[in-house]
From Swiss-Prot:
PANTHER family: ACREF/ENVCD OPERON REPRESSOR-RELATED, TETR-FAMILY TRANSCRIPTIONAL REGULATOR. Gene3D superfamilies: Tetracycline Repressor, domain 2. Keywords: DNA-binding, Repeat, Repressor, Transcription, Transcription regulation. This is Uncharacterized HTH-type transcriptional regulator YxbF. Residues 225-244 bind DNA. It comes from the Bacteria. GO terms for cellular component: protein-DNA complex. It comes from Bacillus subtilis (strain 168). The lineage of its organism: Bacteria, Bacillati, Bacillota, Bacilli, Bacillales.
Amino acid sequence: MPESAEAQVKEALLALLKDRDIQHITMKEIAEKAKVSRGSLYLYYEDKFSIIEDVIEDMKEGLGKALFDAFSHMDTLHLNKKRQTVHPTLSFVHEHRSFFSVMMNRGHFHRFFKDVFQQDVLLAPIHVNLTPIERDIYGHYRALYTYAIILYWLNEDAAASPEAISQKVWELVSQKRFYWLFGKAVPGEREKEKQIDRRVVRTREALQKAFLDVLAEKQDYAGITISDITRKSNIRRATFYDHYANKEELLQTMIQRSCAEIIDHLTIASSPNEFSLKEAEKALAILLSALSNMPIVHFLNREWGVPHVIPDMFKALESFYLHQQTDIHAEKKLYAHYVSAMIIGLLLYRLDEGKAHPPEVLAREFLQFLDVKKYKVVLL
């Protein structure tokens, strides 16, 4: 396929993805949008998924090259001395905005950045020779904070230039501290729960447990029906509708409940800047240990197709951090995005690659990166 036609096909799919999920887009629509014949399209692409995979690989290669070109002449990177430069990732996102605008709000897209950061350039803490586990955790950390920054830019400050966002980013990361992960309780967040009748609580808990059981059996969110849930819970269908309008509302309630539990583990009585590193390690290790018993574990399984989980987690965590009284001079909403991404990234790492490591090790290794301000540039 000529390069111009290939570019048209990719742009056509991205344009269609602005309004619909890829599951609801046909090859016929892509061909019509790109102004190519279906026959020509099928000569080069087996299906629509092979097109989006091709687009993603192009973007990974492009971003990797941009990072390599930006850092290959450097030995070190000091966050306090980069205020007048444009972040190379942000320049690339600006150049390919149509792709990132479509993809950023999709579940698990942070892995795009993790793949890129493992390919060409590694920014390692200046005085540390990273072990394999530290390198893996750090790659996840760097991927998530990049994801959070771009998410903030596209969703909260879309009119800003890459130069303006870069200045905000350097301002933020030059101040970063491990205790940013923690905060004080937000008044009134749990008052409604305390007032609910115990019988109502028991019924809802039974429905939620049944939903989890059915999800584990079917391993497909789309295939779950209200009848499945009521049969499993032995609760009448009419009773289900007394509590939830549909399975989506039930799911939202359970995600919010899990997020509240996560936030409980991050809530401390003292001011965060008085929290010691040892106390932070202990609190984070307890959260990682408790994670396996939370419903959110099932919802984060990519194979089961549960929608909106990561965006909903972002909203809950962002709200918690926005309510904190901080002495941070950077943009507060950017700070909330950044720290929320840190937590979500760590939890995702724990559920995937981090299963083999003790929670205490993950907590310790993760927290040490949050205070690093100076990095050595390692070409891979």
